[in-house]
Amino acid sequence: MEHYISLFVKSVFIENMALSFFLGMCTFLAVSKKVSTSFGLGIAVIVVLGIAVPVNQLVYTHILKENALVDGVDLSFLNFITFIGVIAALVQILEMFLDKFVPSLYSALGIFLPLITVNCAIFGGVSFMVQREYNFTESVVYGIGAGTGWMLAIVALAGLTEKMKYADVPAGLRGLGITFITVGLMALGFMSFSGIQL
């Protein structure tokens, strides 16, 4: 149990997708204007990562890995296309669910919901799972932890962005300029966790 808690904490803070690996920056910067929208997208990323990583782990272990189907057959060259297909299917299911049951969040997320399909944070989580050879349970914990870390970062940035609306930001830094500086300072803060050994 301690191993799984360590893996979760590591994936949320030490190896944060957004602030340590800078993955998923397109949606991270574009949707971080309001806390409510950022929180909704963060939940969507947690759901997609929490399902995509373990499902792709099963696909990789039982189909794509060398000697998984037949001795001597290695289908790992199909990793990228297979993983993207699984992620795309999961995002489509999530999009239909939100459209049906939470239309306000669906309309607030707009084009960024389908973009989760090609969000490099999602694909990065799946790729890290393969590279680190996580088993199924570790994949579930890692997927949920990585999504939680990404949500924590985007909600924190949205909160800071909302506060900066009332700040006296120099004209040349308004908009993306101050956002990049803020993200850089947040990343420096998260770097302090990198010395922790779990």
Swiss-Prot record:
Example GO molecular function: oxidoreductase activity, acting on NAD(P)H, quinone or similar compound as acceptor
Chief location category: membrane
Transmembrane segments: 11-31, 35-55, 77-97, 110-130, 140-160, 176-196
EC number of the protein: 7.2.1.1
Catalysed reaction, written as an equation: a ubiquinone + n Na(+)(in) + NADH + H(+) = a ubiquinol + n Na(+)(out) + NAD(+)
InterPro entries recorded: NqrDE/RnfAE (IPR003667), NqrDE/RnfAE_oxidrdctase (IPR050133), NqrE (IPR010967)
Domain of life of the source: Bacteria
Quaternary organization: Composed of six subunits; NqrA, NqrB, NqrC, NqrD, NqrE and NqrF.
Name the record gives this protein: Na(+)-translocating NADH-quinone reductase subunit E
Organism classification: Bacteria, Pseudomonadati, Pseudomonadota, Gammaproteobacteria, Pasteurellales
Gene name of the encoded protein: nqrE
